Amino acid sequence: MGKKKLLKNYRTTNLINTLEQVDYVVLAPGISFIKNKNLIKYKNKIITDIDLFYLINRNVKSIVITGTNGKSTTCKVIEHLLKKNKLNCFLGGNIGTPILDFNKSKKNYIIIEASSFQLFHSKFIRPDFAFFLNFRNDHLDWHGSKSNYFKSKLKIFHLQSKKQFAFINKKFKKNFLKNKFLSRLITSKQREYKKIKIKIDNDYLTSKINDENMSYVYTFAKLLKISDKSFISSMKSFKGLPHRFEILYKKNNITFINDSKATSFAATEIALSSIKNIYWILGGLPKKNDKINLTTYKKNIIKCYLIGKNISFFEKKVKGKINYSITRNLKNSIVKISKDIKLKKLSNKYLLFSPAAASFDQFINFEKRGEEFKRLCKTYARKFI
């Protein structure tokens, strides 16, 4: 159907008539409910693809994971853990295969990454294991407020029964209890995990957010009666996801890290707090209401390199706080860093691309941005270092 014909058939009046006649409307996550008056009127009919999955599959063991940062990596870690321990599983939702492509034959568990957009509309999501990893300011342009964003995350627990498990950050325990959710509240075994993590020695799991989220995974492993020996062995072989604190290679005490997925400062903070002696590439399309405060992290940053079409915005944030250069694009940044990095004699140095901004000013998505960074590192940085 052509665009003109589609618009003719689905003008506002026709759309409202359609909404009145159907039982449910499966809404795409990118559509802002708050900004559409017609959708608000029919909010009780709006569901998501995950809801539809639960309506179709009533007797499947499900693990649903949400949180501002680290959802995808945590999903992949749990998938890896289950497979290594000979437990069949399916990974879907916002990562991997679309959730409605799930085939339940011979699958012990389904792992679902759920966004705040999906949880906002959720009416049938009832995980056996629900993880609310963390919460930071993000997606406020979609949700309208921090309060709405937080309430969306909490909806992961709404339909759980007394036999199901809720993994939640200690900071939000009061919120959980206030809502009188029925599920069994599980707090992560952080102390126990710290004792064994030294035996894992996996660069892909070294960032502070992964450290925090791994304690949830360890706690989950204990519920499944997976031994420490099996857990350590499984985690040693885990390979991280592309563009998420992705360690490209190490050379002459210099580590190259691709963190292109960091599209907000809240995400970049994790990288800045996890390492020191950083040559940091920053810039892109800043998110609405994103606050950049370098007070805590400036001691870890040797120099910053500003890229993208919003240089003035980022320059105001770093000027007078850290040393910086305006390099405008990734190629110039890598060439400049390759020269600057030789000036400091330090045992360990990090070339970190964690832009703290969306990619759309120069790239179509964060994946393309990350791939370009990797290509340039291979082409230029290795020649100079």
Name each model feature, range by range.
Residues 16-23, 29-166, 170, 174-183, ...:
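Phosphate-binding loop of NTP-binding sites
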Residues 8-21, 329:
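Short acidic low-complexity segments
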Residues 88, 203-301:
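Nucleotide phosphate-binding/pyrophosphate-handling subdomain across enzymes
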Residues 2-14, 192-202:
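Adenosine-cofactor binding site in Rossmann-like domains, unifying the SAM/SAH pocket
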Residues 1-3, 49-52, 170, 181-196, ...:
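Beta-strand->loop->alpha-helix junctions that form or flank phosphate-binding loops
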Residues 1-5, 241, 260-330, 356-368:
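Active-site beta-alpha connecting loops in nucleotide-dependent enzymes
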Residues 333, 337-374:
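A glycine-rich beta-strand to alpha-helix segment
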Residues 25, 65, 94, 133, ...:
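Residue-level signal for inorganic ion chemistry
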